[in-house]
Amino acid sequence: MTISATEALTRCIEHREIFHDEMLHLMRMLMRGEMSPQIASALLMGLRVKKETVGEITAAAQVMREFATPVVTPNPQDLLDMCGTGGDGSHTFNISTTAMFVAAAVGVPIAKHGNRSASSSSGSADVLEALGANLQLSPQAVAECIEATGIGFMFAPAHHGAMKNVAAVRKELGVRTIFNILGPLTNPAGAANQLMGVFHPDLVGIQVRVLERLGSRHVLVVHGKDGMDEASLGAATLVGELKNGVVREYEIHPEDYGLSMMSNRSIKVSNREQSRELVIEALDNVEGAARDIVALNAGLAIYAGNKADSIESALALAFEMIANGAARAKLEEFCAYTRKFAK
């Protein structure tokens, strides 16, 4: 079933949903550059004002996955992605990027999908380069990296070439659109497990249900009640969990796991070098907020990656991997392996 962009815009104005097949058609038009900039921007803003539904986001994510350049691995059902929507305005260091080395040290195979900074002081790609990683890898090289080190990093622009067809519209609009929440839903390696941070509490329930429809295995979607798109030490964290086909929503508190409530002030950064310093500090087991927030998020990743039966036991593993140096060693191993592909 198809629908014209003008008809879709009318639906948005009337606050009516665009159905799945219709959204597939519209999204393919956007990805192929078959929509004028004026209509494309009107449709994106219409969806935003109406508020995108689970069905609309699911269809859009399916199309982005169709158009993506894939990373092919033997067991995508075991892979874990760790990323966030960004846009939380907290300017903290790269917590989930640091936490992936901890989770990988436990044996969770990581296929991280990331980009340069959009709203933060340092995107995942920025800090990984500052740490010495080479990110100019082919899809085959990323797959080899996952096999050899347990970590692969997929630089989003290298895998989503069709996004060039909406880049100018997005830049000119300068506000959030559906594309800001699609990135974490479009892992090129098809990772079936995920720890995703979101910038708004409403997205916790939405994104976990989108991933349910997309066929994910074990997912945690988190939002710190202090506004962070990570599990926070400064407030309770909202969690949407998909496990064994069942969605649950609940809150977790740092004190539940023996962690102290801490302000985010000490983990704010203004550039990638400051972020790099905090990554190293956390992985070197320096006591403080950087280490503890990394351990908390790594614990959630280990649990989502099915290497522990509970968040409590996963958090204990995270602290162990930091204390015994395994997480720092994993960082060095990953960076060294990526440099083998440098031209």
Curated annotation (Swiss-Prot):
<dbReference type="InterPro" id="IPR005940">
    <property type="entry name" value="Anthranilate_Pribosyl_Tfrase"/>
</dbReference>
<keyword id="KW-0028">Amino-acid biosynthesis</keyword>
<dbReference type="InterPro" id="IPR000312">
    <property type="entry name" value="Glycosyl_Trfase_fam3"/>
</dbReference>
<dbReference type="Pfam" id="PF00591">
    <property type="entry name" value="Glycos_transf_3"/>
</dbReference>
<feature type="binding site">
    <location>
        <position position="124"/>
    </location>
    <ligand>
        <name>5-phospho-alpha-D-ribose 1-diphosphate</name>
    </ligand>
</feature>
<dbReference type="Pfam" id="PF02885">
    <property type="entry name" value="Glycos_trans_3N"/>
</dbReference>
<keyword id="KW-0328">Glycosyltransferase</keyword>
<feature type="binding site">
    <location>
        <position position="115"/>
    </location>
    <ligand>
        <name>anthranilate 1</name>
    </ligand>
</feature>
<dbReference type="InterPro" id="IPR017459">
    <property type="entry name" value="Glycosyl_Trfase_fam3_N_dom"/>
</dbReference>
<feature type="binding site">
    <location>
        <position position="229"/>
    </location>
    <ligand>
        <name>Mg(2+) 2</name>
    </ligand>
</feature>
<dbReference type="GO" id="GO:0004048">
    <property type="term" value="F:anthranilate phosphoribosyltransferase activity"/>
</dbReference>
<dbReference type="GO" id="GO:0000162">
    <property type="term" value="P:L-tryptophan biosynthetic process"/>
</dbReference>
<dbReference type="InterPro" id="IPR035902">
    <property type="entry name" value="Nuc_phospho_transferase"/>
</dbReference>
<comment type="pathway">
    <text>Amino-acid biosynthesis; L-tryptophan biosynthesis; L-tryptophan from chorismate: step 2/5.</text>
</comment>
<feature type="binding site">
    <location>
        <position position="84"/>
    </location>
    <ligand>
        <name>5-phospho-alpha-D-ribose 1-diphosphate</name>
    </ligand>
</feature>
<feature type="binding site">
    <location>
        <begin position="112"/>
        <end position="120"/>
    </location>
    <ligand>
        <name>5-phospho-alpha-D-ribose 1-diphosphate</name>
    </ligand>
</feature>
<comment type="subunit">
    <text>Homodimer.</text>
</comment>
<feature type="binding site">
    <location>
        <position position="92"/>
    </location>
    <ligand>
        <name>5-phospho-alpha-D-ribose 1-diphosphate</name>
    </ligand>
</feature>
<comment type="function">
    <text>Catalyzes the transfer of the phosphoribosyl group of 5-phosphorylribose-1-pyrophosphate (PRPP) to anthranilate to yield N-(5'-phosphoribosyl)-anthranilate (PRA).</text>
</comment>
<dbReference type="GO" id="GO:0005829">
    <property type="term" value="C:cytosol"/>
</dbReference>
<feature type="binding site">
    <location>
        <position position="96"/>
    </location>
    <ligand>
        <name>Mg(2+) 1</name>
    </ligand>
</feature>
<keyword id="KW-0460">Magnesium</keyword>
<dbReference type="InterPro" id="IPR036320">
    <property type="entry name" value="Glycosyl_Trfase_fam3_N_dom_sf"/>
</dbReference>
<keyword id="KW-0479">Metal-binding</keyword>
<feature type="binding site">
    <location>
        <position position="230"/>
    </location>
    <ligand>
        <name>Mg(2+) 2</name>
    </ligand>
</feature>
<dbReference type="GO" id="GO:0000287">
    <property type="term" value="F:magnesium ion binding"/>
</dbReference>
<keyword id="KW-0822">Tryptophan biosynthesis</keyword>
<feature type="binding site">
    <location>
        <position position="84"/>
    </location>
    <ligand>
        <name>anthranilate 1</name>
    </ligand>
</feature>
<feature type="binding site">
    <location>
        <position position="230"/>
    </location>
    <ligand>
        <name>Mg(2+) 1</name>
    </ligand>
</feature>
<feature type="binding site">
    <location>
        <begin position="87"/>
        <end position="88"/>
    </location>
    <ligand>
        <name>5-phospho-alpha-D-ribose 1-diphosphate</name>
    </ligand>
</feature>
<feature type="binding site">
    <location>
        <begin position="94"/>
        <end position="97"/>
    </location>
    <ligand>
        <name>5-phospho-alpha-D-ribose 1-diphosphate</name>
    </ligand>
</feature>
<comment type="similarity">
    <text>Belongs to the anthranilate phosphoribosyltransferase family.</text>
</comment>
<keyword id="KW-0057">Aromatic amino acid biosynthesis</keyword>
<keyword id="KW-0808">Transferase</keyword>
<protein>
    <recommendedName>
        <fullName>Anthranilate phosphoribosyltransferase</fullName>
        <ecNumber>2.4.2.18</ecNumber>
    </recommendedName>
</protein>
<feature type="binding site">
    <location>
        <position position="170"/>
    </location>
    <ligand>
        <name>anthranilate 2</name>
    </ligand>
</feature>
